[in-house]
Amino acid sequence: MEKRVVIAVILSIVVLYAFSYMFPPPVANQKEKAGPVAAVQSQPSSAKLSAIDSVPAAATPQAGLAARNIVVDTDLFIAVFSTKGGGLQSFQLKHYKDKAGAVGRDIVLKNESDGDKLSLLSEGKSFGLEPSLVFQSSAKDTKLAGTEKSSIEFTVTSQTGVILKKVYSFSGNGYGINLHQELINTGSSRVEGAISLINYNRLVAETGDGRYEVYGPVTMAGDKVITDKVSDIAKGPKQFDNNVSWSAFADKYFMDAVIAVKNSIASARVAKISDNYVQTNVTSSPLSLNPGQSASMDYRLFYGPKDLDILKAQGSRLEEAIDFGWFSALAKPLLRSIKFFYSYTHNYGLAIIIITIILKVLFFPLTHKSYKSMKEMQKLQPKMVELKEKFKNDRDAMNRAVMDLYKTHKVNPMGGCLPMLVQIPVFFALYKALMFSIELRHAPFVLWITDLSAKDPYYVTPIIMGVTMFIQQKMTPTNMDPIQAKMMLALPVVFTFMFLNFPAGLVLYWLINNILTIAQQAYINKSLPA
């Protein structure tokens, strides 16, 4: 879809404006792969080593125990943890539905019945810690509201006498979860190794709502965000060893992430292990524990929407998981502006209209200058035709004569194009903001448009948009040959078909922009001398 938008914009801007510059009205009596990050020396580990006053008695590994679930219910989500591996079995978002309207059910980011494919499983083979170990926990189901906080603790002891404690901490009104892991060596000899958190993401097919247009691992390593498609890692695992800040798996609207706290992630590895699963391992720096010593490390976990403000609140530049492309610096303030106007209108469609009007007003001086320059060029067209005829056998002489003509009449031949080029980055930034905004997902506008992130179900707005393009085209008469005239006549039809399946929010922007352009062009044509 993005390629079609790029083509649409280029055609619209170049054809609608350049043609009026290149073919003025007749004068009277005048014939878009990231590769794996290179391995470099990792940052120092944040694991805190300390000696303990009394060594806890080593317990027998709990591999034979039956696993049980612990439910954490907050204002925003319902998470189900298992004592098997101390991992996450399911995660359900309360405020986001899979479908618009009353038929929608809560979005489920995780739901694994296979105990071997839970997320946040801990593994440290050198310490005798296997993901299949069943932890002990006295925690009970927990319900939190508002600013209430709580935690659940899991504990297991390996055959080597290493105790692993996992403590998850929650808040009733936040998506972020803190994970504290502590290793205690209760054995009689030193142990060395690293500990990993293992995540499994079940692969799903495209659902038709555009959610999986963007789908795959996202990693921030070496101060860069690397986005991989599932097809990329199907060719081979990706290893990241350079200052890993976070490792995530995301679709267009939602994501889960493990975020390093004080360099707690030394490396990350992403691999497609089967047709159904992608496995991500985030691993600590090497640890060395003498008898009686302990080490701890912390992580920030996130399971939730790709909302710009929510992600930014998590820290570690997690908001950069939203790919706004080259125009990120413009897209973010535009998106925040849309959200600002929504806070007053309570309708994202109206917010888009307001932003479109504001942009049109801001760019009016440039547009006015552009049309004025085109008018001046049109006045010189008869003399240019004479020069081309006079110097038709000497191109260099003709070019010099044309430039002298421009200089004499103080006309800039690029004056009609440059003001339009300035607006292109703003359009692409707004396109990105609308295209990847979770705020528009299932957001109604008026009447039949109940989801601005989906196509217009009755194709009304794309058709009206095509009509406005036709009117706009007719308001810019050009001196074209029959072939060019047919191309211009077909352009609104082509655009209409291209926009039939575009998100209604994006079509709404283009439609309002066309209507404002028609009004603006009528005013300019009336105000400028013929």
UniProtKB/Swiss-Prot annotation:
Role played: Required for the insertion and/or proper folding and/or complex formation of integral membrane proteins into the membrane. Involved in integration of membrane proteins that insert both dependently and independently of the Sec translocase complex, as well as at least some lipoproteins. Aids folding of multispanning membrane proteins.
Compartment list: Cell inner membrane
MF terms (GO), sorted A to Z: membrane insertase activity
Transmembrane portions of the chain: 5-25, 348-368, 418-438, 492-512
Keyword annotations: Cell inner membrane, Cell membrane, Chaperone, Membrane, Protein transport, Transmembrane, Transmembrane helix, Transport
Known partners and oligomeric status: Interacts with the Sec translocase complex via SecD. Specifically interacts with transmembrane segments of nascent integral membrane proteins during membrane integration.
GO biological process: protein insertion into membrane; protein transport
Gene Ontology CC terms, in alphabetical order: plasma membrane
The UniProt record lists the keyword Membrane: yes
Membrane protein topology class: Multi-pass membrane protein
Annotated protein name in UniProt: Membrane protein insertase YidC
Species the sequence originates in: Geotalea daltonii (strain DSM 22248 / JCM 15807 / FRC-32)
Entry similarity comment: Belongs to the OXA1/ALB3/YidC family. Type 1 subfamily.
Chief localisation class: membrane
